[in-house]
Amino acid sequence: MTERVRVAITGGSGRMGRTLIEAAKQNDAILLGAAIERAGSTLMGVDAGELAGVGAMNVAITDSLDKAVDDFDVLIDFTSPEASVIHTDWCAKHGKAIVIGTTGFNHAQKEQISAYSEQVPIVMAPNMAVGVNLMWKLLEVAAEVMGHYSDIEIIEGHHRYKKDAPSGTALKMGEVIAETLGRDLEKCAVYGREGITGERDRETIGFATVRAGDIVGEHTALFADIGERLEITHKASSRMTFANGAMRAASWLSAQGSGLYDMQQVLGLKE
């Protein structure tokens, strides 16, 4: 039997953190070695499995990666951009691989993480669902065939608690389409419309955002021409799809050398 990959999960008490703990419990290739919470949390010492509602896992919540340094090989991080950069810095200093599912990074933060990847293996992906990564491949085909003469819009929806907009997945959709069409997304993106906007510029890629209720994640790319339109949609009904993808990424990453990877490489959709 192949040795299981030992993982640590940051933000263990959050919605996504608890789902990641549950996914680790269910995955035969993964062993939860540590669950990290912020300093001062009242959950210190609580069993991570009990916290996630999946039964005891004999892993107590701790407030420091330093305390867990010998307990894991791959860190899984779905926290905040600022925290993720700090955690990646720690991993680079301690020779630990890291899977980053956080979104909302600015350019400077992405550059920092890229620099750390020269020292350790990193998977960084705005969405780890298998279906979403397949969708990005489909968007390449759609953009090649219809993109030059269609109006392109990206519509995304998430729960009321999501802090960044548009979502990282929506931005990646725009990047895939823009790159396929030879455009610069920073120059052609339009984020929301209001007032008298004038006739639509055919070279633009529009973004619309919904934040409501408990929507886990819905993304649609619209290619609209006169007389027909194509819609490519992905809907997530559970955070578990992201968590399972993160476990798959951690297992794959444990066998890689230093470098910055994405989920499409994990899934074998690109080299």
Curated annotation (Swiss-Prot):
Q: Give the species this sequence originates from.
A: Shewanella piezotolerans (strain WP3 / JCM 13877)
UniProt EC number: 1.17.1.8
Any idea which residues are catalytic in this one?
158, 162
Q: Which Pfam families match?
A: DapB_C (PF05173), DapB_N (PF01113)
Pathway as given in its UniProt record: Amino-acid biosynthesis; L-lysine biosynthesis via DAP pathway; (S)-tetrahydrodipicolinate from L-aspartate: step 4/4
Give the protein's function: Catalyzes the conversion of 4-hydroxy-tetrahydrodipicolinate (HTPA) to tetrahydrodipicolinate.
Gene label: dapB
Task: Kindly give the InterPro entries that the UniProt entry links to this protein.
Answer: DapB_C, DapB_N, DapB_N_CS, DHDPR_bac, NAD(P)-bd_dom_sf
Superkingdom to which the source organism belongs: Bacteria
Gene Ontology molecular function: 4-hydroxy-tetrahydrodipicolinate reductase; NAD binding; NADP binding; oxidoreductase activity, acting on CH or CH2 groups, NAD or NADP as acceptor
**Name of the protein this chain belongs to:** 4-hydroxy-tetrahydrodipicolinate reductase
